[in-house]
């Protein structure tokens, strides 16, 4: 019988939380391209870690190394206390990758039954179908599903083995808002059961809502790491939301404004300092309404960090 994550990986004799996945000084090259450069990265038991970065930053490479699908050129890769290719460790991990290819002629329930047969202690098929919101699609062939429905099947296949460590690479791509939030709730429930989740996503709101810790990777290097609030605190910016008769071009010309977005009837204005921009706005439009000022979000912090990294020559 394989011990559970709670038995062997969550605490040591001193009660400290244990690392269940790590990259230590890892370098990975694809020919002349260096995808990861001396990366040090850890995932602790019972947490959700979001790995964020632009396209080509090294996120998927890092995940594939931890899954044992790639080998590092140098450095050490550890998962659940050992080699990621170890069969016992693979029994305790689940993965949902961006490119998940399964036979299109099999029905949803058949896929779940097939994948469950690979594991020693799988979840009941009914529980997997419910967790992925697939109860009404269990007899549908995979090839007849929409893109969002296929994503939900791939999530079901990732969790059917009752994994202790779950890798989710862009899990909510193609999902509508309701389905995305349902998946978030399922991830929270898994963590509540003692599971550990490593998540990559382009949806910054998703990382903000789910992650205990965020690591930002750019051009193969980890450039920032901390809780979502700690990452956001690294960017001293403000977000101004208002309803105004001013045009978007006029708003963009106001000194101190770094970005303007239209959001239904209102505008969202980003700036390092709110007060001078507010004075300018009110001077230009005395009828301005719906005014809200808030701290910069994770998206602004992410953009600032990756742009600064590129400017400083982190290649």
Model regions and ranges:
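A generic structural signal for secondary-structure junctions
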Residues: 80, 89, 111, 120, ...
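Alpha-helix boundary recognition
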Residues: 91, 130, 192, 208, ...
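ABC-family P-loop ATPase nucleotide-binding domain
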Residues: 1-27, 308-315
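Short, charged/small-residue-rich alpha-helical element at the C-terminal edge
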Residues: 237-309, 315
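ABC transporter nucleotide-binding domain
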Residues: 182-272
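Structural motif detector for alpha-helix initiation sites
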Residues: 108, 125, 228, 295-298
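ABC transporter nucleotide-binding domains
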Residues: 18-21, 28-199, 204-218, 224
């Amino acid at each position: 019988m394989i011990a559970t994550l709670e038995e062997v990986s969550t605490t040591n004799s001193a009660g400290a939380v244990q690392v269940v996945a790590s990259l230590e000084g890892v370098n990975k090259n694809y020919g002349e391209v260096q995808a990861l450069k001396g990366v040090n990265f850890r995932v602790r038991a019972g947490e959700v870690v979001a790995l964020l970065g632009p396209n080509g930053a090294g996120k998927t490479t890092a995940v594939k190394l931890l899954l044992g699908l790639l080998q590092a050129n140098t450095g050490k890769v550890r998962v659940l206390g050992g080699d990621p290719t170890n069969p016992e460790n693979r029994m305790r991990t689940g993965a949902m990758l961006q490119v998940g290819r399964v036979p299109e002629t099999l029905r949803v329930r058949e896929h779940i039954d097939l994948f469950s047969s690979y594991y020693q202690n799988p979840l009941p098929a009914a529980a997997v179908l419910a967790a992925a919101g697939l109860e009404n699609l269990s007899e549908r062939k995979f090839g007849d599903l929409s893109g969002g429905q296929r994503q939900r099947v791939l999530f079901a296949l990732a969790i059917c083995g009752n994994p202790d460590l779950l890798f989710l690479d862009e899990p909510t791509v193609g999902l509508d808002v309701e389905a995305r939030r349902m998946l978030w709730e399922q991830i929270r429930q898994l963590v509540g059961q003692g599971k550990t989740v490593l998540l990559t996503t382009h949806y910054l709101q998703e990382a903000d809502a789910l992650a205990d810790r965020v690591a930002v990777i750019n051009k193969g290097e980890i450039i920032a790491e901390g809780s979502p609030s700690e990452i956001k605190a690294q960017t001293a910016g403000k977000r101004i939301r208002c309803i105004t008769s001013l045009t978007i071009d006029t708003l963009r010309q106001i000194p101190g404004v770094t970005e303007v977005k239209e959001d239904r009837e209102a505008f969202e204005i980003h700036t390092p300092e709110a007060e001078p921009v507010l004075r300018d706005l009110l001077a230009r439009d005395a009828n301005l309404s719906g005014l809200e000022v808030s701290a910069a979000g994770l998206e602004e912090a992410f953009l600032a960090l990756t742009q600064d990294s590129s400017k400083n020559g982190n290649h």
